[in-house]
């Protein structure tokens, strides 16, 4: 049986200066398909909140277009006008309520 943990700091908090992560576990970006339709944002919020509650320190969203030219397909998820802010706020609020951190890709 191991008496030494190979990654002793993995579950320790990490102070980034502007925020502190509860641990060093990062969930990399993956495209779920939920970010492509505004009707699915409540499901996307629940998806990320569940992982935040499950002790993931930082999650990275699937690709979110920063502008129309950055779109990979017609009518993608984006954050390039004020009308798109509320649906993204739904996700960040759910994650923060579960004591998580999230970063948009």
Predicted regions, residues:
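Flavin-dependent oxidoreductase catalytic cores
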Residues: 1-105
């Amino acid at each position: 049986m191991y008496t030494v943990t190979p990654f002793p700091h993995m579950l320790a908090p990490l102070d980034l200066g502007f925020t502190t992560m509860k641990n060093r576990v990062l969930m990399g970006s993956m495209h779920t398909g939920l970010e492509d339709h505004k009707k699915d944002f409540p499901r996307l919020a629940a998806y990320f909140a569940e992982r935040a509650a499950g002790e993931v320190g930082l999650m990275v969203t699937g690709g979110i277009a920063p502008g129309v030219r950055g779109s990979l397909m017609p009518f993608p998820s984006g954050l390039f006008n004020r009308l798109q802010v509320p649906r993204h706020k739904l996700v960040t609020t759910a994650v923060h309520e579960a004591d998580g951190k999230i970063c948009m890709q």
